[in-house]
Curated annotation (Swiss-Prot):
GO cellular component: cytoplasm; plasma membrane
Membrane-spanning intervals of the chain: none
Organism of provenance: Aliivibrio fischeri (strain MJ11) (Vibrio fischeri)
Compartment list: Cytoplasm; Cell inner membrane
Protein's name in the database: High frequency lysogenization protein HflD homolog
Length: 205
């Protein structure tokens, strides 16, 4: 895959979208269904032809692109999103240096793909299986991501499955970010360029 500003912007928008959906799901118990489906589908796209193919099409990343453009302010909501982003990228770095973890992740995703021949991806059992990949493979690498939200919402098993599945999709996008050459310096010094690129994409979708 190409290491261009466009590719980095798409991948980073994927991480932003996952973080934004986690925040919404944890507070309200629901989020944009199309964006959620895009996130889950991205986990299964293990051999994409290009960066956009991970998400299907550019318009499937509208929430993430808007989140990227809006920037993260110092409000509690903005600080929370920033924390999720930093945590996801830190976990991906641990995963990248853990060959066994990457191998296990690939095996577990392969199992999900086989199960999808018989079950719908929206079934509670399937979402539970996807969530368990995050719990079993990613979470033990630490540091643990503390998800904050509405306690009564977060206590519901289905919400927990969806939040963990979304966190796994965030890791998927962070892996993609690294694959297309994304580095910390791009976030510090190249953020303005990514915002401009995101605006261009948003204008055409």
């Amino acid at each position: 895959m190409a290491n261009t500003l466009f590719d980095r912007t798409i991948a980073f928008a994927g991480i932003c979208q996952a973080a934004s959906l986690v925040q919404k799901m944890a507070k309200d118990g629901h989020c944009d269904q199309e964006a959620f489906d895009t996130a889950i589908q991205s986990i299964l796209e293990t051999n994409p032809s290009n960066t956009v193919a991970v998400y299907g099409k550019e318009s499937n990343l509208r929430i993430g692109l808007e989140c990227l453009v809006r920037d993260f302010d110092n409000t509690p909501s903005g600080s929370e999103l920033t924390r999720y982003l930093i945590s996801l990228m830190a976990l991906e770095r641990k995963l990248a240096g853990h060959r066994d973890g990457m191998s296990k992740l690939g095996e577990r995703i392969g199992t999900i793909e086989r199960q999808l021949e018989h079950f719908d991806i929206h079934d509670e059992q399937m979402l539970s299986n996807i969530a368990s990949i995050y719990l079993d493979v990613i979470s033990p690498m630490g540091p643990r991501i503390q998800v904050t939200g509405t306690p009564s919402v977060l206590q519901q098993p289905m919400t927990q499955h969806k939040v963990r599945a979304l966190l796994l999709s965030g890791i998927r996008s962070a892996v993609l970010w690294r694959q297309v050459g994304g580095k910390r310096r791009h976030l510090i010094f190249g953020r303005k360029k990514m915002v401009e690129q995101a605006k261009i994409i948003l204008a055409r979708i």
